[in-house]
């Protein structure tokens, strides 16, 4: 997908201003410059950066808006992105929306890049340079994680950062359905799988009301 094709998709599905385009361009320039120092994304995806990474991230925003409208909820205000790495989807969401976005990334060099990228794009974000389990929990309206951890581990670590109405938007590969099924013994909630607009073999797990199942205990005799 070219830059022009990506911008057309963004305008049709989200609505973007000239200022937003400038912020995206600044972020892309920063990422390209940093690639000389660290591998932020796979080299094989650099030529399709706008489709493989930017639109792949941006597609989560219409899903969030659709979910809020369908359930007649107030617009979400806080977004937690786990393992933000190169800024996908966290910084892209921050550029495209007015939500308060918090990025969690434990790797020092990635944290330094996220700080530079957010400054270059003129986009305010909160960056927590720690492991998730070492962060004081607070509840967020939306939680995302792109290649962060297997689903069961992800829910176990991130559950303290959710409330009952939190929306989970979790990009996964072709094994999304299998991964979801494997969690049903320990977790419950409302879940569905949405197709990815950028890769027919990928999917997005959409979930709400996630909480651990009460484990049955054996009866005393």
Curated annotation (Swiss-Prot):
Keywords from the UniProt entry: Cytoplasm, Methyltransferase, rRNA processing, S-adenosyl-L-methionine, Transferase
Where is it localised? Cytoplasm
Annotated CDD domains: AdoMet_MTases (cd02440)
Which cellular component terms (GO) are annotated to the entry?
cytosol
Identify the InterPro entries for this entry: rRNA_ssu_MeTfrase_G, SAM-dependent_MTases_sf
Q: Name one GO molecular function term.
A: rRNA (guanine-N7-)-methyltransferase activity
Q: What is its main location?
A: cytoplasm
Question: Enzyme group, top EC level?
Answer: transferase
Going by the entry's taxonomy, the superkingdom of the source organism is recorded as: Bacteria
Q: What is its EC number?
A: 2.1.1.170
The reply to whether Transferase figures as a keyword in the UniProt entry is: yes
Show the HAMAP family listed in the entry.
Answer: 16SrRNA_methyltr_G
| Function (record text) | Specifically methylates the N7 position of guanine in position 527 of 16S rRNA.
Descriptive protein name: Ribosomal RNA small subunit methyltransferase G
User: Which species expresses this protein natively?
Assistant: Zymomonas mobilis subsp. mobilis (strain ATCC 31821 / ZM4 / CP4)
């Amino acid at each position: 997908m070219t830059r022009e094709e990506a911008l057309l998709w963004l305008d049709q599905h989200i609505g973007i201003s000239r200022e937003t385009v400038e912020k995206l361009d600044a972020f892309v320039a920063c990422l390209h410059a940093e690639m000389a120092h660290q591998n932020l994304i796979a080299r094989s995806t650099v030529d399709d950066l706008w489709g493989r990474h930017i639109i792949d991230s941006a597609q989560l925003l219409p899903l969030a808006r659709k979910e809020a409208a369908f359930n007649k909820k107030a617009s979400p205000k806080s977004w937690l992105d786990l393992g933000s790495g190169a800024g996908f989807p966290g910084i892209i969401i921050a550029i495209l929306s007015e939500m308060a976005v918090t990025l969690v990334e434990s790797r020092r060099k990635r944290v330094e890049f996220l700080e530079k990228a957010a400054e270059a794009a003129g986009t305010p974000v909160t960056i927590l340079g720690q492991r998730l389990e070492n962060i004081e929990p607070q509840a967020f309206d939306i939680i995302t994680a792109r290649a962060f951890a297997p689903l069961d581990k992800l829910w176990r670590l991130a559950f303290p950062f959710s409330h009952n109405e939190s929306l989970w938007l979790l990009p996964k590969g072709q094994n999304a359905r299998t991964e979801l099924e494997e969690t049903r013994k320990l977790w419950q909630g409302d879940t569905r799988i949405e197709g990815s607009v950028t890769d027919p073999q990928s999917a997005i797990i959409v979930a709400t009301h996630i909480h651990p199942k009460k484990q049955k205990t054996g009866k005393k005799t």
